[in-house]
Curated annotation (Swiss-Prot):
Gene3D superfamilies: Pseudouridine synthase, PUA domain. Disulfide bonds: none annotated. Responsible for synthesis of pseudouridine from uracil-55 in the psi GC loop of transfer RNAs. It catalyses: uridine(55) in tRNA = pseudouridine(55) in tRNA. This is tRNA pseudouridine synthase B. Keywords: Isomerase, tRNA processing. The active site is at D47 (nucleophile). It is an enzyme of class 5 (isomerase).
Amino acid sequence: MVRRRKGRVIHGVILLDKPTGISSNDALQKVKRLYGAEKAGHTGALDPLATGMLPICLGEATKFSQFLLDSDKRYRVIAKLGERTDTSDSDGQVVQTRPVHVDYDTLLACIAKFRGETDQVPSMFSALKYQGRPLYEYARQGIEVPREARKITVYEIELHRFEGDEVEMEVHCSKGTYIRTIVDDLGEMLGCGAHVTMLRRVGVANYPYERMVTLEQLNALVEQAHRDEKAVADVLDPLLLPMDTAVEALPEVNVIPELMTLIQHGQAVQVSGAPSDGMVRITGGEQKLFLGVGEIDDNGKVAPKRLVVYGE
């Protein structure tokens, strides 16, 4: 018996500008429903408080979402000095209030200490799991559980504004970096406490900021399509970026048509000019059809790891 599909087959990446106040999964489900997509997944959750770039992979692009999850991120953040909360952001309860006696030079010096590789202990209010449950579930019950410090890298952290008790910064960091934790640590370093009042992700990997679209824009396009008696796909699909943009940081290996079939059947092949090791992005023929991702094996061959299945 042929399984009935629960959506249409559509492949690509849409850069959603997530609004504040909803979870990343809620945003994902709204986009999936608007596109009528059979399969969809996001590439790293944003806090409900946070806004900004949330790449959503549709169809076969979901196979490559991990590469975006592992990529560098950029954030704009506004912190309020003088108040520490139990969640390190304005969604939490204020647990400590202290006077703010911070000058510009001291603030700059403290911010500079976050640059480079450091060990960061994740917040209890995070989606990381302990014994199968998200940490925030324990935190809401007042239970603190052990968390291992993780290596993170802050490539750049810049002070954009310091007015009264507000500090605005931009942070370029590695995957797994908790901006709330940076702000909480900064507040303790300054001796006054701090928490996040605004957090916006402005970059994931090399995706262009200007290609982001909001849920309001998507809904408006769908409504206009209905009024004009057009197919929703005709107005929404042009917003999708090609699925190989999720892995564009990987070196490309182009295989001749004769080798494409072997690759698509999971066989490792020898390709002249391929790197000596590491992961690669595999394309085929003169058209450079994206075939998937492979890895250079011990014999120097390109071994396919995740392949695109085209068609229905």
